[in-house]
């Protein structure tokens, strides 16, 4: 059973039902809907397709709705592109104007208040670099071109040294969030997170709608890297969004930041997605480059919960082949023993000390006796997250009467969730779920399995029971 999950961005190449079915059957675990593109009608149609396929295949593929965030862009250029010359002076205006080699506009009105002399402005993913000479703090910034080149219309702008004051959620994001919550999407990706406060604000909006969507904090700003300890406490999951991150921080720092964020996620039992350019050459090619194979492999070895595809599956020539290829790499890496057994002793002063201790000892016992699987009953999904964070070699099966977490758990390393709502007795439940797994050939007669539950079984309290037994 594959443990590291695969997230794929959907688009024109992967929206047809039969294409998506093949992706489901070849290892896809989470469908990402990118709100930067497409209409609500298109998104609603693909969400319906995902849910139909879950019914038809018996899988629980999750849906991640990715909010665009406050993307700052240049305005329109004369003849669609202009050349900025090294050493020349260029004016940036917040007033709309046709861009030339000496001036262009930007879509963020408060930028002149935010920037200071000496700070750098990066254009088109860092291909062009400007330095702020002065600002009138109203509508105009004077810059010097440090590294010139061709600047096209509507290109992204990054500010590696500047604290931007614009809100984390734009008006478009709020509309997209309303749609996502209305559609009961499992995970919400929050772009350009700068601090834990951004997560708290989004959670408040989700709670106001009385929804249970979980939050992925996309780490792509230097401020987020600095505040990672507070962010990881507030969020439900993390994404190492290496595209903008690699522009805003020195690119040579990204691999170590990736490893650090994955370790934080494991420490706090929060899933981590590694994203951007993982197999980008497969947008057009039938096989990945060797560097891409190593990139995916290293994310798995680092301990990522999931690896993500973007253009490869949204607009690529063969999205099914991309899923198959990534699935093959992931499974091969999971044969390496070094990715398992990351148990951390539970802290006695934690509110969930008893549950954490049960999970810790289940994983430790599983290693000692070579248990085939750890089976847990959970209403909130907490034990699934906690057990997964300890990276046991045993398979992890979560049984729940809470349908909302069935798909959410599909993002979590090693976890497979099943709907189960019988509560006759603890012994009956343990025997019954072993029988169900045996029927699906996920465990076999003679396998050792570990069961976790709360007693009495009908309560949704802390897990306080651990049982080791054979499958009969």
Task: Locate the predicted segments by residue.
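Non-catalytic helical/linker scaffolds that mediate oligomerization, partner binding
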Residues: 1-472
